[in-house]
């Protein structure tokens, strides 16, 4: 909130008038200082300062302004500027009646001081009525240009467009001694209107004491003499002082304190309801802090014989004290609930961390088992591949042996066929020899023919013997080869039987390995399914550890973070989590 403050206090006494002194201003800063014609004196012992009145109101309220009697208004350069703002008077005919002071309200942009007509001037100095009081009034004008940042100050009771004047009147009362006459004192009221750029101060010198002047610097260096407004223009150039006498001490206006206390009470109540709302949002138990006889207790604490305004102010104060007590209890209960919820959260977090560590250990164990299963499966596949390759080699060798056996059988059948042909030829030759012998015996009977026949017979017999011997050798050779072939075939058949037996063993081992691989693949799929489904299905075999724990699903402290959080009282619903830990380890056969 940007505001401008102006204050002026003056202490005047009887004496000759000096020329008014113009106090220059320094821009963008406000300074309050004192000037004195002599050295600063120690504080007076017989002077008592008493705060008489404090009043606040909007800009449309009547503000008392004083000016010399029947004086014309002298417009200063300050009033002609565009930034000058005037007060708006609510009633132009209102007058404040006093035995010694007549104050009238005027139109905007005018300031008047009405002097009592009974006062006279008999000398160049002003004749002052003996009045043992000096009133010092202070005006503070605030111009709030924006709303306060706090959300508790925003509401229907805040009007950012109104300028508020705080009038602070301080009476300086001088104690009079019995043996000493009354020193004439003067009372002056200086009213500073909103946004003055230059403040002028006129001081009068007193023979007995020094004159102190307190001024305030504004923003612009424009200056005028306030003496033009307080002095009459005449030949003697005598300054007429205003003599103000009050009826007595002004009464304290209770409206300001009443409004202030009411505003504080409303803000205290809003704070209490805000705390109560937050306590309900986090799920705390709403305790009944209100007592039935609270109003009776407040009324009993108010003393009797006071005015209604004072009673109302005391009532506001007592209500604010009770509301502050309730707010304190609500804050303490809220902190206790938050501490309890944080304890629950910490316990749940520790249990979840422990479960997470156990699950990670179980998962690492299953990962090692899975790696062992994969290594075993890879070794089984390599052995199976080697066995299949050896089986293919043995089957190719068996096929080659069978082909050789078939070729030997074909050669043996050919040799038997040739042997039969040779026997048939032998029979034909014997038959032909016999026929020739019969012909020769029939036709020729001499010794030469007999010799020729013997010779031919011998020749044929030798030829037959040679041929028989040759054929016998060939038959023996073929038989030996056939026996050798039979032996080779029998050996090869034995090796084939060995191969067949070994092949049968390999096929049986392969079937066992296939069944083992199927079983391990099923277990592996189950393990993967358990890993993916987060241990929803129990694994077959092995040792299984089941851990059952209950966790709270509602945390009311989260209501402070989310507006749409719905609190469910504890104990109504809990979630049960079952943790299964399996320890299955495969051993290689």
Curated annotation (Swiss-Prot):
Biological processes per GO annotation: actin cytoskeleton organization; actin filament organization; bicellular tight junction assembly; epithelial cell morphogenesis
Claim: Coiled coil is one of the keywords in the record: yes
One cellular component (GO) term of this entry: desmosome
Coiled coil among keywords: yes
Effect recorded for residue 329 to Q: In POF2B; disrupts binding to non-muscle actin filaments; abolishes tight junction localization; altered ciliogenesis and cystogenesis
A GO MF label: actin filament binding
Organism domain of life: Eukaryota
Subunit note: Interacts with nonmuscle actin.
Annotated protein name in UniProt: Protein POF1B
Organism of provenance: Homo sapiens (Human)
């Amino acid at each position: 909130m940007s505001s401008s403050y102006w204050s002026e206090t003056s202490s005047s006494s009887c004496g000759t008038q000096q020329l008014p002194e113009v106090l220059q201003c320094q821009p963008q800063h406000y300074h309050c200082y004192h000037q004195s014609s002599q050295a600063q004196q120690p504080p007076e012992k017989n002077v008592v300062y008493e705060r008489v009145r404090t009043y606040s109101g909007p800009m449309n309220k009547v503000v008392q302004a004083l000016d010399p009697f029947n004086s014309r208004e002298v417009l200063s350069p300050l009033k002609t500027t565009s930034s000058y703002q005037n007060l708006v008077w609510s009633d132009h005919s209102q007058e404040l009646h006093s035995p010694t002071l007549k104050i009238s309200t005027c139109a905007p942009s005018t300031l008047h001081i009405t002097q009592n007509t009974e006062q006279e001037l008999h000398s160049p100095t002003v004749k002052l009525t003996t009045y043992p009081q000096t009133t010092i009034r202070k005006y503070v004008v605030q111009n709030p240009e924006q709303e306060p940042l706090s959300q508790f100050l925003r509401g229907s009771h805040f009007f950012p467009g109104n300028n508020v004047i705080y009038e602070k009147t301080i009476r300086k009362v001088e104690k009079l001694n019995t043996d000493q006459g009354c020193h004439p004192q003067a009372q002056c009221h200086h009213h500073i209107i909103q946004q003055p750029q230059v403040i002028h101060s006129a001081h009068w010198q007193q023979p007995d004491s020094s004159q102190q002047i307190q001024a305030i610097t504004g923003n612009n260096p424009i200056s005028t003499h306030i003496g033009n407004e307080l002095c009459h223009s005449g030949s003697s150039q005598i300054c007429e002082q205003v003599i103000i006498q009050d009826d007595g001490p002004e009464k304290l206006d209770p409206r300001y304190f009443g409004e202030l206390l009411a505003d504080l009470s409303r803000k205290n109540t809003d704070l209490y309801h805000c705390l109560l709302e937050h306590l309900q949002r986090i799920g705390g138990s709403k305790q009944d802090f209100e007592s039935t006889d609270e109003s009776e207790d407040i009324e009993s604490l108010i003393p009797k014989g006071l005015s209604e305004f004072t009673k109302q102010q005391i009532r506001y104060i007592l209500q604010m004290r009770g509301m502050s007590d309730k707010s304190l209890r609500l804050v303490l209960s809220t902190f206790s609930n938050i501490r309890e919820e944080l304890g629950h959260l910490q316990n749940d977090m520790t249990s979840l961390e422990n479960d997470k560590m156990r699950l990670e250990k179980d998962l690492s164990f299953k990962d090692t088992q899975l790696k062992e299963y994969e290594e075993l499966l890879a070794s089984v596949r390599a052995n199976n591949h080697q066995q299949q390759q050896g089986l293919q080699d043995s089957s190719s060798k068996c096929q080659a042996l069978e082909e050789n056996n078939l070729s030997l059988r074909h050669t043996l059948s050919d040799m038997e066929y040739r042997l039969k042909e040779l026997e048939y030829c032998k029979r034909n030759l014997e038959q032909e020899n016999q026929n020739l012998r019969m012909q020769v015996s029939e036709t020729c009977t001499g010794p030469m023919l007999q010799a020729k026949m013997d010779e031919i017979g011998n020749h044929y017999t030798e030829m037959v013997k040679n041929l028989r011997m040759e054929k016998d050798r060939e038959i023996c050779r073929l038989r030996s080869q056939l026996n050798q072939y039979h032996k080779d075939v029998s050996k090869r058949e034995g090796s084939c039987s060995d191969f067949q037996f070994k092949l049968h063993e390999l096929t049986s081992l392969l079937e066992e390995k296939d069944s083992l691989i199927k079983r391990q693949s099923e277990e592996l799929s189950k393990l993967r399914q358990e890993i993916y489904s987060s241990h929803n299905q129990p694994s077959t075999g092995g040792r299984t550890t089941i851990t059952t724990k209950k966790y709270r699903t509602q945390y009311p402290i989260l209501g402070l973070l989310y507006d749409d959080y719905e609190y469910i009282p504890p104990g109504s619903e809990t979630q049960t989590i079952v943790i299964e830990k399996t320890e299955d380890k495969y051993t290689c056969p």
